[in-house]
């Protein structure tokens, strides 16, 4: 019991280390994540069991890498494609409570866990869909994801799903968490910008981690 509590405190410290102006509600919501995921992961495996004790580093803080590149505005519409257990969508929804997040996954049991975590946290700015992204009819300011496919494939899935109106410093498009050498993968995307996460986070885990921003033209 003591170990679990201590681990949670240490884990929360890594969030506070890089995001020091959280509200009491945000602190409470972030602090609940490990317990919620640990409980649901015993029933439905959505996070690697070896990662569950490092949830805040490998999943929560990694998801929040997008927030170091983009501060979503109130009322913005963001879709998380292939959200899995809710990453990066849920941590971003906690950090940006006035931004609307749509979490999509084709695997029903994963969306079930996401729905339960969202309910457990009392988050009101998240909606979910069990289905394929190609079936989604809405458009968004940004589409986020965590390496669910090669960029060529991912771009094809979401190319018609961005708003025309621009409201942010970065142009509407994809914000993609990726890792490793992306030279070949991004060869056909000269407008892509790579943000290296070691510039924001000092932990070894982020050594090769990146956020890729790919602006996309509106196609009505």
Question: What function would you assign to each model-found segment?
Answer:
Residues 155-171:
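A short glycine-rich, Lys/Arg-flanked "PGG" loop and its adjoining helix->strand segment in the class I
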Residues 167-181:
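Conserved beta-strand signature within the Rossmann-like core of class I S-adenosyl-L-methionine
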Residues 64-145, 155:
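Conserved SAM/SAH cofactor-binding pocket of Class I
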Residues 41, 117-118, 162:
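Conserved hydrophobic residues forming the short capping helix/wall of the S-adenosyl-L-methionine
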Residues 29, 47-67:
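Conserved SAM-binding loop and adjacent beta-strand
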Residues 1-45:
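N-terminal auxiliary segments of SAM/dcSAM-dependent transferases
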Residues 181-220:
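Active-site capping/gating segments
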Residues 147-150, 182:
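Short glycine-rich anion-binding loops that position phosphate/pyrophosphate groups of nucleotides
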């Amino acid at each position: 019991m003591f170990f679990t509590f201590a681990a949670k405190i240490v884990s929360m410290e890594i969030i506070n280390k890089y995001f020091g102006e959280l509200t009491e509600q945000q602190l409470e919501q972030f602090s609940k994540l490990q317990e919620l995921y640990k409980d649901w992961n015993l029933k439905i495996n959505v996070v690697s069991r070896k990662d569950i004790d490092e949830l805040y580093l490998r999943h929560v803080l990694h998801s929040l890498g997008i927030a170091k590149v983009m501060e979503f505005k109130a009322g913005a519409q963001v879709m998380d494609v292939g959200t899995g257990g809710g990453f990066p969508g849920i941590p971003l929804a906690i950090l940006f409570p006035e931004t609307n997040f749509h979490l999509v996954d084709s695997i029903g049991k994963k969306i079930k866990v996401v729905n339960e975590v969202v309910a457990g946290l009392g988050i009101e700015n998240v909606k979910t869909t069990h289905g394929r992204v190609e079936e989604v009819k809405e458009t968004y300011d940004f589409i986020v994801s965590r390496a669910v496919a090669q960029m060529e494939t991912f771009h094809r899935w979401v190319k018609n799903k961005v708003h025309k109106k621009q409201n942010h410093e970065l142009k509407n498009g994809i914000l993609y968490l990726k890792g490793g050498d992306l030279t070949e993968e991004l060869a056909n995307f000269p407008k892509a910008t790579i943000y290296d996460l070691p510039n924001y986070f000092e932990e070894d885990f982020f050594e090769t981690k990146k956020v890729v921003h790919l602006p996309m033209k509106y196609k009505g």
